[in-house]
Amino acid sequence: AEGIENRLVAPPPELRRGCDLALEINLVEKPAVERMLGSRQVHFIDILPTRGGTELLQVVQVTDFGEAVMVKAGNMKLTFDKVSGVVLNISGGGCPDIPYLHAEMLAKPLDRAPRPREMGHTLCSLMLDRAYVQSLEIWKNGGR
Protein backbone atom coordinates (compact mmCIF):
# COMPACT_ATOMS: atom_id res chain seq x y z
CA ALA A 1 0.00 0.00 0.00
CA GLU A 2 1.67 3.15 -1.23
CA GLY A 3 2.35 5.67 1.50
CA ILE A 4 0.53 3.61 4.12
CA GLU A 5 2.52 1.67 6.68
CA ASN A 6 1.41 -1.97 6.55
CA ARG A 7 2.56 -5.49 7.30
CA LEU A 8 1.45 -8.82 5.82
CA VAL A 9 0.14 -11.05 8.62
CA ALA A 10 -2.09 -14.05 9.18
CA PRO A 11 -5.46 -13.17 10.65
CA PRO A 12 -6.25 -14.54 14.10
CA PRO A 13 -8.03 -17.92 13.96
CA GLU A 14 -11.42 -16.49 14.93
CA LEU A 15 -11.35 -14.10 11.95
CA ARG A 16 -10.21 -16.59 9.30
CA ARG A 17 -12.58 -17.47 6.51
CA GLY A 18 -10.44 -19.88 4.52
CA CYS A 19 -6.97 -19.45 3.06
CA ASP A 20 -6.65 -15.86 4.26
CA LEU A 21 -3.98 -13.26 4.61
CA ALA A 22 -4.34 -9.91 6.26
CA LEU A 23 -2.70 -6.53 6.10
CA GLU A 24 -2.01 -4.91 9.42
CA ILE A 25 -2.64 -1.17 9.16
CA ASN A 26 -3.19 1.72 11.51
CA LEU A 27 -7.00 1.83 11.83
CA VAL A 28 -6.89 5.63 11.49
CA GLU A 29 -5.94 5.02 7.84
CA LYS A 30 -8.98 2.80 7.16
CA PRO A 31 -10.77 5.31 4.88
CA ALA A 32 -7.61 5.87 2.80
CA VAL A 33 -7.05 2.12 2.51
CA GLU A 34 -10.67 1.56 1.45
CA ARG A 35 -10.39 4.28 -1.21
CA MET A 36 -7.10 2.93 -2.51
CA LEU A 37 -8.35 -0.66 -2.72
CA GLY A 38 -11.60 0.46 -4.35
CA SER A 39 -9.82 2.60 -6.95
CA ARG A 40 -7.72 -0.41 -7.94
CA GLN A 41 -10.71 -2.76 -7.94
CA VAL A 42 -9.12 -4.92 -5.25
CA HIS A 43 -11.74 -7.00 -3.46
CA PHE A 44 -11.39 -7.50 0.28
CA ILE A 45 -13.60 -9.06 2.92
CA ASP A 46 -13.44 -6.46 5.67
CA ILE A 47 -11.32 -4.03 7.63
CA LEU A 48 -11.58 -4.95 11.29
CA PRO A 49 -9.98 -3.69 14.48
CA THR A 50 -8.33 -6.29 16.66
CA ARG A 51 -10.20 -6.69 19.91
CA GLY A 52 -8.29 -6.85 23.17
CA GLY A 53 -6.66 -10.29 23.23
CA THR A 54 -6.99 -10.85 19.49
CA GLU A 55 -3.47 -11.01 18.18
CA LEU A 56 -2.38 -10.97 14.56
CA LEU A 57 -0.08 -13.88 13.81
CA GLN A 58 3.28 -13.79 12.12
CA VAL A 59 2.97 -15.14 8.59
CA VAL A 60 6.34 -16.94 8.75
CA GLN A 61 7.18 -19.44 11.49
CA VAL A 62 10.36 -21.53 11.76
CA THR A 63 10.75 -24.97 13.35
CA ASP A 64 14.22 -26.48 13.82
CA PHE A 65 14.27 -30.30 13.69
CA GLY A 66 18.02 -30.63 14.28
CA GLU A 67 19.22 -31.76 10.84
CA ALA A 68 16.40 -30.00 9.01
CA VAL A 69 14.44 -26.78 9.27
CA MET A 70 10.78 -26.29 8.38
CA VAL A 71 9.63 -22.81 7.42
CA LYS A 72 5.88 -22.28 7.46
CA ALA A 73 4.37 -19.30 5.69
CA GLY A 74 0.60 -19.16 5.83
CA ASN A 75 -0.52 -22.71 5.05
CA MET A 76 2.62 -23.60 3.09
CA LYS A 77 5.59 -25.45 4.57
CA LEU A 78 9.08 -25.88 3.11
CA THR A 79 11.54 -28.23 4.82
CA PHE A 80 15.25 -28.23 3.92
CA ASP A 81 18.47 -29.89 5.06
CA LYS A 82 20.46 -27.45 7.23
CA VAL A 83 23.85 -28.47 5.83
CA SER A 84 23.22 -28.98 2.11
CA GLY A 85 20.23 -26.67 1.72
CA VAL A 86 18.43 -29.38 -0.26
CA VAL A 87 14.65 -29.05 -0.29
CA LEU A 88 13.33 -32.16 1.50
CA ASN A 89 9.60 -31.48 1.37
CA ILE A 90 6.96 -28.96 0.40
CA SER A 91 3.46 -29.33 1.80
CA GLY A 92 0.29 -27.45 2.54
CA GLY A 93 -2.08 -25.30 0.60
CA GLY A 94 -4.51 -26.64 -1.93
CA CYS A 95 -3.78 -24.49 -4.94
CA PRO A 96 -3.35 -26.08 -8.37
CA ASP A 97 0.22 -24.86 -8.95
CA ILE A 98 1.70 -26.41 -5.80
CA PRO A 99 2.24 -29.96 -7.18
CA TYR A 100 4.21 -28.43 -10.07
CA LEU A 101 6.26 -26.23 -7.74
CA HIS A 102 6.87 -29.25 -5.50
CA ALA A 103 8.20 -31.26 -8.46
CA GLU A 104 10.42 -28.39 -9.63
CA MET A 105 11.93 -27.62 -6.21
CA LEU A 106 12.19 -30.99 -4.45
CA ALA A 107 15.70 -32.45 -4.01
CA LYS A 108 17.39 -29.23 -5.21
CA PRO A 109 19.58 -26.95 -3.11
CA LEU A 110 17.74 -23.77 -2.21
CA ASP A 111 20.14 -21.60 -4.20
CA ARG A 112 19.44 -23.64 -7.36
CA ALA A 113 15.72 -24.20 -6.89
CA PRO A 114 13.40 -21.90 -8.84
CA ARG A 115 11.65 -19.13 -6.92
CA PRO A 116 7.97 -19.96 -6.43
CA ARG A 117 6.84 -16.43 -7.31
CA GLU A 118 8.45 -16.78 -10.75
CA MET A 119 6.48 -19.93 -11.56
CA GLY A 120 3.29 -19.82 -9.49
CA HIS A 121 0.25 -17.59 -9.66
CA THR A 122 -1.74 -18.31 -6.49
CA LEU A 123 -1.83 -17.29 -2.84
CA CYS A 124 -0.20 -20.65 -2.04
CA SER A 125 2.75 -19.88 -4.34
CA LEU A 126 3.06 -16.42 -2.75
CA MET A 127 3.27 -18.03 0.69
CA LEU A 128 5.67 -20.70 -0.58
CA ASP A 129 7.85 -17.88 -1.92
CA ARG A 130 7.85 -16.30 1.54
CA ALA A 131 8.94 -19.65 3.02
CA TYR A 132 11.58 -20.03 0.29
CA VAL A 133 13.11 -16.58 0.91
CA GLN A 134 13.23 -17.18 4.68
CA SER A 135 14.67 -20.68 4.16
CA LEU A 136 17.42 -19.34 1.89
CA GLU A 137 18.33 -16.71 4.47
CA ILE A 138 18.41 -19.29 7.29
CA TRP A 139 20.55 -21.68 5.23
CA LYS A 140 23.02 -18.94 4.23
CA ASN A 141 23.35 -18.06 7.94
CA GLY A 142 24.37 -21.61 8.83
CA GLY A 143 20.93 -22.96 9.69
CA ARG A 144 20.06 -20.27 12.24
Question: Where in the sequence are the language-model features?
Answer:
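Structured beta-strand/loop patches that form or line metal/cofactor-binding pockets in enzymes
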Residues: I47-V83
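Ordered, small/hydrophobic-rich secondary-structure cores
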Residues: A1-R16, K82
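General beta-strand structural signal in soluble alpha/beta enzymes
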Residues: L8-V9, I45-I47
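Short, intrinsically disordered low-complexity segments
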Residues: R17-A22
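Active-site- and interface-proximal helix/loop "cap" or "latch" segments in soluble metabolic
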Residues: K30, V69-R144
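Short amphipathic alpha-helices in soluble, non-transmembrane regions
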Residues: E2, V33-V42
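A broad structural signal for short, well-ordered beta-strand segments within beta-sheet-rich domains
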Residues: Q41-F44, V87
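Helix N-cap motif at beta-to-alpha junctions
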Residues: I25-P31
